[in-house]
Regions:
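Noncatalytic regulatory segments and standalone regulatory/sensor domains
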Residues: 100-114, 123-162
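Solvent-exposed loop/turn segments at secondary-structure junctions
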Residues: 7-8, 20-22, 70-73, 92-96, ...
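Structural motif
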Residues: 87-89
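Short regulatory "switch" loops immediately downstream of catalytic or recognition motifs
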Residues: 56-57, 91-103
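Envelope-exposed proteins and targeting segments
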Residues: 84, 116-118, 128
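Cysteine-nucleophile protease catalytic domains, especially the papain-like/related folds used
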Residues: 1-85, 159-162
Length: 162
């Protein structure tokens, strides 16, 4: 329901500007493409915050979504230890991130994506592993070291509900 009714979507709308750079829709604020097909590309934290806040407000929840991009893995583990799951930007199967492609937004920010970019929820950890709730694979356990490497490669992007 959250994706179908609350997630802001847009096409990439790519074009070359007079400066010769490729421009397109801000994927931080919109899911690019259709989230229900393989043609859907990706979205950033802004789109998830918008969707979550809309859903939470409509269900009467006092919770709100917050973009905490830039948080260290230790900060994520602290939140999980306190019972707060964290939406994290990672890759499918926690594989190394593939080569990225991207474009500039109208405000000049560069946004990129890779064919194995993915979002999931960090729900647990040990000294050597992390537990992820993955919308594709279900509950998965990965090497903590690999998670931290992949999380960093995705710009330490993350969202929490408070």
């Amino acid at each position: 329901v959250m994706a179908s009714e609350y997630l802001p979507t847009a096409s990439a709308n790519r074009y070359y500007g007079a400066d010769g750079r490729l421009y397109g829709t801000d994927m931080n604020e919109y899911f690019i493409g259709d989230p229900f097909t393989e043609g859907g590309i990706i979205c950033g934290t802004g789109a998830i915050v918008t969707a979550a806040d809309g859903y939470l407000a409509d269900t009467g929840s006092a919770l709100r979504a917050y973009d905490i991009t830039g948080s260290s893995p230790e900060e994520l583990y602290r939140r999980v230890r306190n019972g707060q799951p964290v939406v994290v930007w990672v890759t499918i199967s926690m594989a190394d991130r593939r080569a990225a492609q991207g474009w500039y937004t109208e405000n000049g920010d560069y946004v990129d994506w890779s064919t194995n970019d993915h979002g999931a929820v960090l729900i647990g950890y040990t000294d050597t592993t992390v537990t992820i709730a993955d919308p594709i694979s279900g509950r998965m356990e990965y090497s903590r070291e690999q998670f931290e490497k992949v999380f960093s490669s995705r710009g330490n992007r993350c969202v929490v509900l408070e």
